[in-house]
């Protein structure tokens, strides 16, 4: 299959620039790929799609205020660093601007020198490995100096940074939010749990590769970015019990899907506690091993995320659903509306 097979027309005005006032008031398009049905609904009705005994699996990663603005002490030139992932200790892979001025050994100061970065390796496409030095606790220093790294297609400033976090965000480490989870409120999750649905959490730290366009025509030539994931023994046991009792594993978002399917692929369909790095690329032809249904936002044309949804529900039907969403003025991308896929 080619990248262009996953293209569709998307009017720019449908790209949501701000979150809705209430998280769960977004629209929800419920699709069933076997029955070939589509139903327009609202997100707080997602509870009606969940059965007692099902497991709802969510990614509890937390977005770091990963964009830092500093200057070189020798030239006072302005520098921007975007933290991508913690490689070891105080070393991070970052995206640097302007990268060409930052050679190995270069230093950058942030916040009157409260945080310092030394370039220790140069990567391609403006990437660098830096080592930070600071007093105190790194995350506290970062909270005071860093800014939330909103996706490149969002041009308006976010009034409340917590609206780019899920209500259950816990594990620091992402450069972007797992946006399918932004629709849930604490109250809605309580109602879902009261219905007899198991709430299960895993972690996948979302990298900026999630926004990287597919630059090749042939999907087999695309290199997926790697992201760190973790599933605890308690969570794995709950999911095994749910499967054994005939319940469904319902994933919230593509990051939860990629984690569960990475583990399912690694353990021949079994669900085991595990952690590591995944670069799984789920595209049409992939056989799902763990996930039975999922919710997700509406994604960019020609993106790996549209390909993932198509792997589950079929490309033609997914593109038909996307055309319906465009016609019905659904809001797209991170702050947009959601889809529930049976």
From Swiss-Prot:
Pathway: tRNA modification; tRNA-queuosine biosynthesis
UniProt keyword list: Cytoplasm, Queuosine biosynthesis, S-adenosyl-L-methionine, Transferase
InterPro entries associated with the record: QueA, QueA_dom1, QueA_dom2, QueA_sf
EC class (word): transferase
GO BP field: queuosine biosynthetic process; tRNA wobble guanine modification
UniProt-listed Gene3D superfamilies: QueA-like (3.40.1780.10)
Protein localization: Cytoplasm
A GO MF label: S-adenosylmethionine:tRNA ribosyltransferase-isomerase activity
Catalysed reaction, written as an equation: 7-aminomethyl-7-carbaguanosine(34) in tRNA + S-adenosyl-L-methionine = epoxyqueuosine(34) in tRNA + adenine + L-methionine + 2 H(+)
EC identifiers of the protein: 2.4.99.17
GO cellular component, one term: cytoplasm
UniProt keyword S-adenosyl-L-methionine, yes or no: yes
Family the entry assigns: Belongs to the QueA family.
HAMAP family listed in its UniProt record: QueA
Assembly description: Monomer.
Reported function: Transfers and isomerizes the ribose moiety from AdoMet to the 7-aminomethyl group of 7-deazaguanine (preQ1-tRNA) to give epoxyqueuosine (oQ-tRNA).
Name of the protein in question: S-adenosylmethionine:tRNA ribosyltransferase-isomerase
Annotated gene: queA
């Amino acid at each position: 299959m080619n990248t262009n097979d996953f293209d569709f027309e998307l009017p720019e005005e449908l790209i949501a620039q701000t979150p809705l006032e209430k998280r769960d008031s977004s629209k929800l398009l419920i699709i069933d790929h076997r029955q070939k049905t589509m139903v327009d609904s609202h997100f707080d009705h997602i509870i009606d799609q969940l059965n007692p005994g099902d497991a709802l699996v969510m990614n509890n990663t937390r977005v770091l205020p990963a964009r830092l603005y500093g200057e070189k002490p020798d030239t006072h030139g302005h520098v921007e660093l975007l933290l991508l992932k913690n490689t070891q200790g105080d070393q991070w892979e970052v995206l640097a601007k302007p990268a060409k001025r930052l050679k190995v050994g270069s230093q950058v100061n942030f916040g009157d020198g409260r945080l310092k970065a030394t370039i220790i390796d140069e990567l391609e496409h403006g990437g660098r490995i830096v080592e930070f030095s600071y007093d105190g606790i790194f995350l506290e220093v970062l909270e005071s100096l860093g800014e939330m790294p909103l996706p490149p297609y969002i041009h308006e400033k976010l009034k409340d940074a917590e609206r780019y976090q899920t209500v259950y965000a816990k594990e620091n480490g992402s450069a972007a939010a797992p946006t399918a989870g932004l629709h849930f409120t604490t109250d809605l999750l309580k109602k879902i749990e009261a219905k007899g649905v198991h709430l299960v959490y895993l972690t996948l730290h979302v990298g900026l590769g999630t926004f990287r366009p597919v630059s090749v025509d042939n999907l087999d030539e695309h290199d997926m970015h790697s992201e760190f994931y973790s599933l605890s023994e308690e969570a794995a046991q709950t999911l095994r019990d749910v499967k054994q009792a005939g319940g469904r594993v319902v994933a919230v978002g593509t990051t939860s899907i990629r984690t569960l399917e990475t583990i399912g692929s690694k353990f021949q369909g079994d669900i085991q506690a595990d952690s590591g790095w995944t670069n799984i690329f789920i595209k049409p032809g992939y056989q799902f091993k763990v996930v039975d249904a999922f919710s997700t936002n509406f994604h960019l044309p020609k993106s790996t995320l549209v390909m993932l949804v198509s792997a589950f529900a079929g490309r033609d039907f997914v593109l038909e659903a996307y055309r319906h969403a465009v016609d019905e003025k659904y809001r797209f991308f991170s702050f947009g509306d959601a889809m529930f896929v049976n």
